[in-house]
Amino acid sequence: MEEKYNRNRIYIKPDEQEKIKHFRVLLGGAGIGSIIAECALRMGFETITIIDGDKVEESNLNRQNYRLEDIGNYKAESLAKRLLSINPRANIRVINEFVTHDNVEKLIERHDIAINALDFKSDIPFVFDKICSEKNITVLHPYNFGWAGFLAVVDPDGKPLQGLSGKPLGFELKVAEYVLGYQAFWMQPQEWLEKVVKQYQREDVTLPPPQLSVASWITAGLCTHAMFNIATGKDVKKFPKFYLSSLLL
């Protein structure tokens, strides 16, 4: 095992370390994806494609993997620069484009797993999942619930996340409502999240959901662990089941 991964020993076998090194990760969206990318890289995922046409804004700095000096620069480029400063030998591919109907199929090709961290401003996140399913690619859906990290793993042959709502506007809220209903059914109500959802529902529907750095890092850990399990043939929970992690649970 390479020296930089020496502390992974016991948890990760040498052959598993080699597998994840070449496991091709597609990162659709470099918001919460920016935290996931670094967590994955540090564990040994060295083949990552970053797709995002957005640029860094000051409001991103409370929860995303950027610095003041990155403001105004492309997120994908800034993130790649940071990742390569950690591991210069990593295979980091940068695409400074938004995912569209015209390019989505080409972008998804030749990857082993996809992270759908795209903004729900159009139906593109749904199209992204559909094409991944057609290409037999598992999709990870990470969400930032402030004090809690959420991850849904969508199997190519399983139930699509789009089943929660066919409308992109307010989709994050639908996911939160689904979590609340699921937890209540299993006698694990999340009153803190209910309060957040009710307050957010009173805001302008066009406002993005509030998010904290806490959940960004929790979710990054969930995603990286799930990718490791998938890459090495271990089990993961598939949607409609999900992962939810917080001190408040």
Model-derived regions, located:
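Hydrophobic/small residue at the entry helix of a nucleotide-binding pocket
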Residues: 32-33
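E1/E1-like adenylate-forming module used to activate ubiquitin-like modifiers
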Residues: 113-214, 248
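A short, aliphatic-rich alpha-helical micro-motif
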Residues: 107-109
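Conserved SAM/SAH-binding loop
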Residues: 96-104
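Phosphate-binding loop/pocket of nucleotide- and phosphate-handling active sites
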Residues: 1-11, 229-249
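N-terminal charged helix/coil linker that caps or initiates catalytic domains
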Residues: 1-26, 58
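Glycine-rich phosphate-binding loop and adjoining beta1-alpha1-beta2 segment
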Residues: 47-87
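Mid-domain beta-loop-alpha active-site segment that forms a flexible
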Residues: 211-231
